[in-house]
Amino acid sequence: MYGHLSLSTLSLLAVVAAAPFPESWLQPRDSDVSQLFRRGAPDPKASDYLSYYPSPGSTPNVSTIPQAWLDKLATVQLPNVSVATANDGRPTYPNNENDGDSEICSFTDQCYVEDDLYSPPGEKVWALSFDDGPTDVSPALYDYLAQNNISSSATHFMIGGNIITSPQSVLIAIEAGGHLAVHTWSHPYMTTLTNEQVVAELGWTMQALSDLNGGRIPMYWRPPYGDVDNRVRAIAKGVFGLVTVLWDSDTNDWAISDQPDQYSVASVEAYFDTLVTGNRTQGLLLLEHELDNNTVEVFETEYPKAVANGWSVKNVADAFSMKWYLNSGKGNDDVVTTMSVAGTLTTAKPTHTSTSVASATATSSASVTDSAGVSIASAASSQESSSWPIANRPSLFVIACGLALAAIMV
């Protein structure tokens, strides 16, 4: 589920680097995106916490998409790239279109663009990241990171459905100083989704992470299976300001199996050894997972070897000398740099489907925080009845506006 053999280890020399995005694909640098996400965060301990989000495990229904996201999508000029079709684990395009062409630039065909993060600069810099969390083994991994004082040196690309079903694990990662990023809502092949479905997969995951992390807006995302093309890139960056993160080497830890013809812990560790104990000095951005005990075991075995061989371990943002979040600098306790206003908090009660709402209770609790993080004002609460679907609720958090987005697009 979490990988496929056509995306095995990528050689630097085999990867086709395409030109940077045409400027016309992206939203204007002075565009106001602050209205995309604005609302107070729900309490993850509350019994109705899950009702604030789409159901986990599948792509959110387009009816759940806030209108502000769709309005922003409508302003983004997208490249002329068709929606792909899943074909035995490899997305294919209609009319015999070549996924490696620069117009499409699918990473499935080992093509990436200049704006993608692929291999970190600097000698012996390991950009440490883990996909697919939080899972049952995540707390053990987070303990190991903390014991080795490297919690803040890891980026966790989290799945939205996992976030809302295991919010306490996310909070542990946040408290320890982990860097949080987006791995979509349900781990689909993104190039096979419509534009609106891509928006839903990314936006709701950003929403869930920001709600738990003090309004900090994720700045990075990694496509499941590495499945991204120029259409999906343009939506991610044009609508949400997200930077696409890929990898220069696949550890294949996701493929570990007891079957004799599959990868084993020993074989994955042997390949890992060639990366961190050999003569390589160029930076590493590996595909690794917090998926099960095997993936955690591989990392815990290889990390000491890397350190002993002079590797410097950093999270993705630090490895590329970039800030952690769209609206905050470095760390989970750094000041949120844009003005933030918590709007109406609406509790949705699902009825017969995961995307319809029969009734809602709205509690308004507005507050304003200045650039120094000082609370300026708060408003009283009120309750009222409503029958809004999720898509019509006020947005949930403040995303970085013009200057923040411009900074990452330079």
UniProtKB/Swiss-Prot annotation:
It comes from the Eukaryota. It is a lipid-anchor; GPI-anchor. Residues 1-18 form the signal peptide. One of its GO terms (cellular component) is side of membrane. Keywords: Carbohydrate metabolism, Cell membrane, Cell wall biogenesis/degradation, Chitin degradation, Chitin-binding, Cleavage on pair of basic residues, Cobalt, Glycoprotein, GPI-anchor, Hydrolase, Lipoprotein, Membrane, Metal-binding, Polysaccharide degradation, Signal. Glycans are attached at residues 61, 80, 149, 279, 293. Co(2+) binds at residues 132, 183, 187. It is an enzyme of class 3 (hydrolase). One of its GO terms (biological process) is chitin catabolic process. Its main location: membrane. Changing residue 219 to L: In strain: CAP 67. Residues 124-314 form the NodB homology domain. Acetate binds at residues 131, 225. It is found in: Cell membrane. The active site is at residues 131, 289. One of its GO terms (molecular function) is metal ion binding. Residues 19-39, 386-410 form a propeptide. InterPro entries: Glyco_hydro/deAcase_b/a-brl, NODB_dom, Polysacc_deacetylase_ArnD. Belongs to the polysaccharide deacetylase family. PANTHER family: CHITIN DEACETYLASE 3, GLYCOSYL TRANSFERASE-RELATED. Hydrolyzes the N-acetamido groups of N-acetyl-D-glucosamine residues in chitin to form chitosan and acetate. Chitosan is required to anchor melanin to the cell wall, for maintenance of cell wall integrity, and for proper cytokinesis. Chitosan offers an advantage during infection as it is less readily detected than chitin by host immunosurveillance mechanisms. This is Chitin deacetylase 3. It comes from Cryptococcus neoformans var. neoformans serotype D (strain JEC21 / ATCC MYA-565). The lineage of its organism: Eukaryota, Fungi, Dikarya, Basidiomycota, Agaricomycotina.
